[in-house]
Amino acid sequence: MAMRSWTPDQGFVDRKLVRPASVSTSLSLELCTFPSTLGSSVAANALEQLLVVEKSLQGDYFTCNEEVKTFLKDITVAVKKLEEMRKNTIELLEIESMELSRLYFLLETVPNSMHKELQECILEARRLNILEISQVKGKIEKTNDEIKFLNDKIIELKNMNEALGIKQVELAKQHAKFVLLLNQTLEEKAVATICINDTYTRIKFEKEEIGLQKQCLQDATDLIEKHKQEHRKKKERLAERIKDVKQSCEEKRKEAYNKRKELTRLQNKIIKMKQTVTTNAVMINDKSLEIMRLRETADLWKKKVEDMKRVCESLEEKLLFFLTHKQQIDSVSSEKKSGFISQIQQVAEKLQKINKENKDLRDRLNTLLKQYKITLKEEEAMSLQRQKMAEEHQKQMELLNQKETFLTQRKLDIKNMEEGFSTLRDLNVATKEVYRKQIKLLTENLERELQRWVVNQWRLLCSRKRHSRWLHKTKLTLRKIITEIEIAEEKRRQLLKETKRRQKEISRFVNQIETIKEQLEVEEKEYIKKEKKLMKELNKYEDLIIKEAQINKVKEEQLVETLPRLQIAEDDFQEKSRTLKSLQNDISAKKQEETLLSTYIFRYRKDIIRCTNNTETVKRDMRHIRTLESEKTQSHFEALKNLENEIYVNDQKLALLILENKKLRDYLAYLKKHTKEYSEKQIVTVQNSGDLSWQLIAQHSQYSDLLAEFQIKIKELVDTGEETLQEIRSLASKLRYRDEKIESISAWLLGGIERLHSLMEEESPSSLSKEDLQKAGMKQKEEKTLRFSPSLHTRRDTLSRNCKMIKKRSRSPKNKP
């Protein structure tokens, strides 16, 4: 990819070429090149895109949370600081290159021999750099192998999961079998309890029989006590012998230690004798180990005797209890004596075996004493040999004194030679130290750049993962929001339809109410007219009744004729009164209907107002959500652009990492599917058998632990990103320190070069004598053996060749005259 540099005047400039370093060297000192931005195109591209983000933040269209704004502003400030630090480093490197070019120019004035030596030093430094690069590549290959190994482990874990699924089914089957087995075992336990009760009764009878046998053991205890006394006496004798042996061993060890101190001063022959002494010491140690084994056996016998004592005490306590039962068991004991006599004979045989073992131990002690005497004789012979070696040692010490005198003379000669070659040594050492420091700095820079590259790639992968997750989440949220919006729109349409329908119904009800009001008014008027007519008729009838009451007596016959008419009139009156009541009830019902309609109309109006308010709030929320979504999409799109601009090196490796990421995603999806399957299986198993639920819970906890470990690793890798800024700051401080060192070195080199020029002018090459050159050569060889590392054999060869050439040149002018 093309490199892009940023400047405050022109902004970002595309530069496809690579600018060489501003260092003037000879043909053999061609240094590497570096890009225009010194590997900081990532920061430049990030700054360009963050400027776009700042513009969008300042605009009205771009709206987002305050936290996001602060986060982006902090990023812009950090990137600006990085850019400033980058510029400072570039300036420092340019100053460094100028100073190095000046130093190289001064070095060209140095004689050819020094110039060639410096060239060879630089070539070897480059070779060392190549070796270090190869080592780094080897480490990368190792990491790739580790990644492959982890992939193999993942495949194995998959197989393990499949095997666990099969085992789970088998465990479910086994659970059913175990339930049946439990039922069987419970039945067997019931049978066993019955058997235990029977055996308990039998054991009681057997205990009574054992009491009889213990009486017979009393005789055996008497014999055992006699043997114990004899054994104690033997033990005391052995302890006295062991003490004597220990004292003699300690004395001999002290003598051997004093003699070893004397033997350390000897040289080659004494070393051989040491080997023989060590072999003898090993033999003595083996014998001491055998003595320790005998002690352990004695301790074991002590423990056995104590156990027997305990048994005897327990038997004595039980004998008191059994004496009371003696009279009852005398009749039975006579029959079983024969069996117990046979047991007593077995005990006697065991005692005989123990006596045999004691005899074997005595034989071993005798053999050890014999071996000890043999070792004493060998040590006496060794003492004679040591005396002989001491005499030889004195002779060798005299030879060493002679050699030391010779070496002192040689050292004086070497010191005289060192004084003539000290100036050249100092120059050589200084140049080596400078080049070593430069090589170290270059290696550190290379390692840091590799670490940054790895960290940036890892951040890319993490950011892509996060972005993919965020996209997935946003898509889901958008789908949910879209569905909710569609539902809200459908509800809004339904509400509009219902409001229209209700308005139409309300208008109908209003029209009906108005018509009903008009009808009621007409009916009321008619009813009033009818009431007036009826009142008039009633008045007439009352007058007639009064008249007829007065004339009742006279006109009883006429009343008989008028009775049917009265009945008809009464019926009409009752019917009219009923019609009045029904009309009154209808009027009250219609009034209630009017009140209900008014309440319904009021409620519908409130609902319509609420719907309108809700639609406005929903619209506002939709607008706010759309703005947030647009802001987020723009911010993430810009972040993607930043990340794409940062990827300019090692596209093949990045593709491989992406493939691995896809594999990991597939594997995570596969694990999620398996977790879902396991959860479903868990539900089934819980329904079938509650005892197997803990296994599924354990598996789920393992998966959660793995995810937690993965998240912890991600956090650790994120924390390493903060360390990169600190490394940049430390690099700037180191560069300043390096500038100061280079200034001091340059001043020192200028003084040394001026001295060399003065020496070259004062003394010609012909004036150099053979002795000075020989001293210089010897000094150079000695310096090689003392100062140079084994990796600089080639440099030694070149220096030796130069010395030979100087010798030939010095001899040639002497031979000519």
Swiss-Prot record:
Keyword list, A-Z: Coiled coil
Name listed for the protein in its UniProt record: Coiled-coil domain-containing protein 175
PANTHER family given in the database record: COILED-COIL DOMAIN-CONTAINING PROTEIN 175
UniProt keyword annotation of Coiled coil present: yes
Stretches that traverse the bilayer: none
Phylogenetic classification of the source organism: Eukaryota, Metazoa, Chordata, Craniata, Vertebrata
Coiled coil residues, start to end: 130-166, 217-594
Basic and acidic residues composition bias: residue spans: 769-786
Region of interest: Disordered: 761-817
